[in-house]
């Protein structure tokens, strides 16, 4: 076997391989012998068919199969010999084959980039220092009450957190526009569902009033014909409702799994959940900064084959989220996913190099801790832990999570890490 390797462009490689004629003939003869043992041909007993008859009938197809097999095996031998690490599926380019002559073919592919980590000591990471305060728990309890609130009619003017039922008709330059009219439209105030100025124009009015408000569509509005346009909306305010918050009764508290139904028990449960969320948020905030610094400090070429593969993964994930199938996934434009796919490949390659250079392996105690932390959010944590322990794929996924955490910690060990006091709400809003 003769092998030559050339760089085509960037990470592209072209390996040219020549297989000796006698190697081909020996492989063909060997395969024909195997075929002769199995085939049935009229007039001959099984296994007793003359080789010339077998060769005449099956020679062409056997030779084609043998060439395909030899091309694959010799390519594997070549990349092992040349210490080449292909990224993605190779493209075989067969040369012209002539009976009794050496056969030359080429294989085109990309290789993984050579990554030499640098600039880790210049990465700056700001670690949030946060604790869940009594005031944070109070705010969360108020949120829970609002989520369970009922609505009652209100005689007074509309306030910031009321709910209104309205008819409205919008116009630009005196002309009504598509999508600018609705009847019995229910709007919960303060959620930012409408364009700027719409809710403000309703506040202070009472049920039964009809009035006109002036607003301006944002420049980034989705409808091209309305971007930046001044508009008028005629509003018929039909109903105003205000929240009626439930009291923290034993019955209400037990809805949240607090068996004793006490306020103290609910506060303890809420605090525990908030602290679990907080731990994850701090971890994610630190991790994102470390990875961002790692990417900025290390520009690398990325194999197109790996980006294509990652785009396919993202397409399928997107289709699954919206109930689509494989065919619909492939129809999604690659441009939607290209930037994210490239980013994921770059991060994977860099963290892979961190893992390699630090000789990291998944810490089983960490894996166990991650599973227990995740399971604590469920009603029966022990059942979730047992389910994971019996599922190899889930365990492997969690080992990958642990290994990634260990790689990030290796980066942080060399980075400049400072601490910054912040509040629970500020940190959680950054995560949103």
Swiss-Prot record:
Residues 161-246 form the PPIase FKBP-type domain. InterPro entries: PPIase_dom_sf (IPR046357), PPIase_FKBP_dom (IPR001179), Trig_fac (IPR005215), Trigger_fac_C (IPR008880), Trigger_fac_C_sf (IPR037041), Trigger_fac_ribosome-bd_bac (IPR008881), Trigger_fac_ribosome-bd_sf (IPR036611), Trigger_fact/SurA_dom_sf (IPR027304). Pfam families: FKBP_C (PF00254), Trigger_C (PF05698), Trigger_N (PF05697). GO terms for molecular function: peptidyl-prolyl cis-trans isomerase activity; protein folding chaperone; ribosome binding. GO terms for biological process: 'de novo' cotranslational protein folding; cell division; chaperone-mediated protein folding; protein transport; protein unfolding. Consists of 3 domains; the N-terminus binds the ribosome, the middle domain has PPIase activity, while the C-terminus has intrinsic chaperone activity on its own. This is Trigger factor. The gene is tig.
């Amino acid at each position: 076997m003769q092998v030559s390797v050339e760089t085509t462009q960037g990470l592209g490689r072209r390996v040219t391989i020549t297989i000796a004629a006698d190697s081909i003939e020996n492989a063909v003869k060997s395969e024909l012998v195997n075929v002769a043992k199995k085939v049935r041909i009229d007039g001959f007993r099984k296994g007793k068919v003359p080789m010339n008859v077998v060769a005449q009938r099956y020679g062409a197809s056997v030779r084609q199969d043998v060439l395909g097999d030899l091309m694959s095996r010799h390519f594997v031998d070549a990349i092992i010999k040349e210490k080449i690490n292909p990224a993605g599926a190779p493209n075989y380019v067969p040369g012209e084959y002539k009976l009794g002559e050496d056969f030359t073919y080429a294989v085109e592919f990309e290789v993984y980039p050579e990554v030499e980590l640098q600039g880790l000591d210049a990465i700056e990471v700001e670690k949030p220092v946060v604790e869940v305060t009594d005031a944070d728990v109070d705010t969360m309890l108020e949120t829970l009450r609002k989520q369970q609130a009922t609505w009652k009619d209100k005689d007074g003017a509309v306030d910031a957190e009321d709910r209104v039922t309205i008819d409205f008709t919008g116009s630009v330059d005196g002309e009504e526009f598509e999508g600018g009219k609705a009847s019995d439209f229910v709007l919960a105030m303060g959620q930012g569902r409408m364009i700027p100025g719409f809710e403000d124009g309703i506040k202070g009015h009472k049920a039964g009033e009809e009035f006109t408000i002036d607003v301006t569509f944002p420049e980034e509005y989705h409808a091209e014909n309305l971007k930046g346009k001044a508009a008028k909306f005629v509003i018929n305010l039909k109903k105003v409702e205000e929240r009626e918050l439930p009291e923290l009764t034993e019955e209400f508290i037990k809805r949240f799994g607090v068996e004793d139904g006490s306020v103290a028990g609910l506060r303890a449960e809420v605090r525990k959940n908030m602290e679990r969320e907080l731990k994850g948020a701090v971890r994610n905030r630190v991790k994102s900064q470390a990875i961002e610094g790692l990417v900025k400090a290390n520009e690398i070429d990325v194999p197109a084959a790996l980006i294509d593969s990652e785009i396919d993964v993202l397409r399928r994930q997107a289709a699954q989220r919206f109930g689509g199938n494989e065919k619909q996934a492939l129809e999604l434009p690659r441009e939607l996913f290209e930037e994210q796919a490239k980013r994921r490949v770059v991060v994977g390659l860099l963290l892979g190099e961190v893992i390699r250079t630090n000789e990291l392996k998944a810490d089983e105690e960490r894996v166990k801790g991650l599973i227990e932390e995740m399971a604590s959010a469920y009603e029966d944590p022990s059942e979730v832990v047992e389910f994971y322990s019996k599922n190899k794929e889930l365990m492997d996924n969690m080992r990958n999570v642990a290994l990634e955490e260990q790689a990030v910690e290796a980066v942080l060990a060399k980075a400049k890490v400072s601490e910054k006091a912040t509040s629970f709400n500020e940190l959680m809003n950054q995560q949103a």
